[in-house]
């Protein structure tokens, strides 16, 4: 029984460390809110998108409890606008594309699907015109 408790405790510590690491990537993107240079790995981009969705759901719940119509969700998305654009531009740089590719999302349906396809691509190996490969750092 003692051994099971020790293993369980170590497993919980490992899970906590992994959660903190994922949250750290979200915070790192917020710190780089005005950095449109360089590259962003898939993990950095998608962890930011994941936590952004989680916090938007929480903001929506708060809106529902208070009876407001999208006030907190709207404020949250407004606050996340520049960090989201910055990490998206860096994500495009990682696959060797210009940040201007973000405008493809303005093409209904097909543009958003193409952008999704681009964001799930692995970054270019080695250096490219936008900087060093963040995977190697």
Task: Label every model-predicted segment.
Residues 23-24, 66-86, 99-121:
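Selective recognition of hydrophobic, aromatic-rich stretches within alpha-helical transmembrane segments
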Residues 48, 52-56, 60:
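Hydrophobic alpha-helical transmembrane segments in multi-pass membrane proteins
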Residues 2-51, 84-100, 117-137:
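Membrane-interface extramembranous regions at the lipid-water interface
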Residues 61-65:
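Juxtamembrane "helix-exit" motif on the non-cytosolic side of transmembrane helices
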């Amino acid at each position: 029984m003692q051994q099971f408790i020790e293993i369980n405790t170590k497993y919980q510590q490992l899970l906590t460390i992994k959660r903190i690491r994922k949250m750290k990537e979200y915070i790192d993107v917020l710190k780089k809110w005005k950095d449109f240079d360089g590259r962003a790995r898939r993990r950095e981009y998608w962890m930011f998108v994941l936590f952004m969705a989680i916090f938007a759901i929480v903001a929506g719940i708060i809106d529902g409890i208070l009876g407001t119509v999208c006030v907190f969700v709207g404020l949250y998305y407004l606050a996340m606008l520049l960090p989201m654009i910055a990490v998206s531009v860096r994500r495009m740089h990682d696959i060797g594309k210009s940040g201007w590719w973000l405008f493809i999302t303005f093409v209904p349906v097909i543009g958003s699907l193409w952008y999704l396809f681009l964001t799930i691509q692995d970054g270019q190996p080695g250096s490219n015109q936008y900087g060093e490969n963040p995977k190697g750092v």
